[in-house]
Amino acid sequence: MMMLESRNSMRASNSVPDLSLQISLPNYHAGKPLHGGDRSSTSSDSGSSLSDLSHENNFFNKPLLSLGFDHHHQRRSNMFQPQIYGRDFKRSSSSMVGLKRSIRAPRMRWTSTLHAHFVHAVQLLGGHERATPKSVLELMNVKDLTLAHVKSHLQMYRTVKCTDKGSPGEGKVEKEAEQRIEDNNNNEEADEGTDTNSPNSSSVQKTQRASWSSTKEVSRSISTQAYSHLGTTHHTKDNEEKEDTNIHLNLDFTLGRPSWGMEYAEPSSDLTLLKC
C-alpha cells in the first residue's frame, strides 16, 4: 500500500507543473550560519562594509587633482577661436567686396548743365591735367554721382582736350564734345534694358568706338580749317607789307631855276638826282 501511494504521488507530481517563481533575496553571508557567538564577525563585516561605503563616498566628494593638461588645452582652444572668427570675418568681407564689385553702377546722364558744372570744377582745380576724379567729385557735390562716373568723364574730357590743344576753334570743339556726350547718353538710354554680358555688348562697344573716332575726326577737321585760315590771313598780311614797302615817297628835287626843267622837257642822263 505504501508503495502504491508513493507511486501515485510521484505520478501526480510529474503530471502537474511547478509554477512557483522561487524568488529569493540575495544573501551575502549565505555560507556563514548565524549563531550567537558569531555576532562580532557580523558586526565587523558590517563595519568594514560601512567603512568601505564611507571611503567611497569621501572619494567621490573629494576634489580630483589633475596635472592641468586639460585646462591648458581648453585655454589654447579659446585662444584659437578669435582667429577663426577673424578669418571668417575676412572671408565674409571679401565676399561682400566681390558682390559690390559685381553690382553694376547706375547710369548717369551728363546733361549740358552738369557738363558745364564739371568744366567749372576742373578749371577751379587748375585744368584737366592737374584735376583728379576725387577732387572733382568733392568739388561738384552732386547727388548720385559716383567716382567711376567722374573718372570716365574726366578721361574723355582729357582726350578731347589733348587732341585739340592750342587750336583756335576750342569753343566749337567743346560744343561738338557736348553734342557727342548727349548722343552717347541717348545710346546708353536706348541700351539700358540690355545686360552687359549679352552679345549686344560688343555692338554697343563698337558704336561707342565709332562715336569716339568721329569726334576725333571732327576735331581734327576743325583744327585743320583753323590752321588753314590762319595761313591765309598771314599770307595776305605779308603781301600787304610788301606793297607798303614798294611804295616810296617822291623826294626828288633839282638845283637851278624852276623854269629850267620846263625848257628842257626831255630828261638827260647827266642830271644828278638827290634822293633822301
Curated annotation (Swiss-Prot):
Residue stretches of biased makeup (Low complexity): 39-52
Q: Where is the composition biased (Polar residues)?
A: 195-220
Among SUPFAM superfamilies, the record links this protein to: Homeodomain-like
Where is this protein chiefly located? nucleus
**Compositional bias per record (Basic and acidic residues), positions renumbered to this chain:** 171-183
> Is Lyase among this UniProt entry's keywords?
no
**Compartments (UniProt record):** Nucleus
User: Which GO cellular component terms, listed alphabetically, does the Swiss-Prot or TrEMBL entry include?
Assistant: nucleus
Q: Note on file?
A: Plants overexpressing KAN4 show reduced or absent ovule outer integument and color alteration of the seed coat.
Name used for this protein in its record: Probable transcription factor KAN4
Which source organism?
Arabidopsis thaliana (Mouse-ear cress)
Q: Which gene encodes it?
A: KAN4
